[in-house]
Swiss-Prot record:
Oligomeric and partner information: PTHrP interacts with PTH1R (via N-terminal extracellular domain).
Record gene name: Pthlh
Biased composition (Polar residues): 76-90
Comp. bias regions, Basic residues: 122-132
Entry keywords, A to Z: Calcium, Cleavage on pair of basic residues, Cytoplasm, Hormone, Nucleus, Secreted, Signal
Organism annotation: Mus musculus (Mouse)
Region of interest (Important for receptor binding), residue spans: 57-68
Cellular component annotations (GO), alphabetically ordered: cytoplasm; extracellular space; nucleus
Domain of life: Eukaryota
Family of the protein in this entry: Belongs to the parathyroid hormone family.
Pfam families, sorted: Parathyroid
PROSITE patterns recorded: PARATHYROID
Protein name (database record): Parathyroid hormone-related protein
Disruption phenotype: Lethality at birth, probably from asphyxia. Mice show widespread abnormalities of endochondral bone development: bones are shorter, wider, deformed and undergo premature mineralization.
Posttranslational mods: There are several secretory forms, including osteostatin, arising from endoproteolytic cleavage of the initial translation product. Each of these secretory forms is believed to have one or more of its own receptors that mediates the normal paracrine, autocrine and endocrine actions.
Length: 175
């Protein structure tokens, strides 16, 4: 019985490992046709990475669960024959003190508490001094009125260009 089973398995392994041409092509040719594309390789790589990441998360979650559920060992369960390590002092363990709030840093040791400043409501903007623009216009007029005196001497015929006319309009002035 065992001998017959071994014979069947050996024939099966031989047939599977022997390359038989299929449809006139060799098995190596079929292997080339079945090559995966780069995108398929990337997909399989990403899938493997995500599975590995999931396994790592489960492992870490299980590990953290063991840490959090581990029993807290009391320090009083020390064996009676053990000696404390040399150069160490037995101080009581204190996690907080009663006078902790008394000695704070300089910034937080203020008597007054912080008060929020009220937000400014948006209002009208302040305007400049009233009449300042008028003063500037008066100065310009003064300088303009001083120009015709130079025209009388023959230096300038037209002191100011007329901005109301465009260059396409015919000249209405007679010279």
């Amino acid at each position: 019985m065992l001998r017959r089973l071994v014979q069947q398995w050996s024939v099966l392994v031989f047939l599977l490992s022997y390359s038989v041409p299929s449809r006139g092509r060799s098995v190596e040719g079929l292997g080339r046709r079945l090559k995966r594309a780069v995108s398929e390789h990337q997909l399989l790589h990403d899938k493997g990475k995500s599975i590995q990441d999931l396994r790592r998360r489960f492992f870490l979650h299980h590990l953290i669960a063991e840490i959090h559920t581990a029993e807290i060992r009391a320090t009083s369960e020390v064996s009676p024959n053990s000696k404390p390590a040399p150069n160490t002092k037995n101080h009581p363990v204190r996690f907080g003190s009663d006078d902790e709030g008394r000695y704070l840093t300089q910034e937080t040791n203020k008597v007054e508490t912080y008060k929020e400043q009220p937000l400014k409501t948006p209002g009208k903007k302040k305007k400049g001094k009233p009449g300042k623009r008028r003063e500037q216009e008066k100065k310009k007029r003064r300088t303009r009125s001083a120009w015709p005196s130079t025209a009388a001497s023959g230096l300038l015929e037209d002191p100011l260009p007329h901005t109301s006319r465009t260059s396409l309009e015919p000249s209405l002035r007679t010279h």
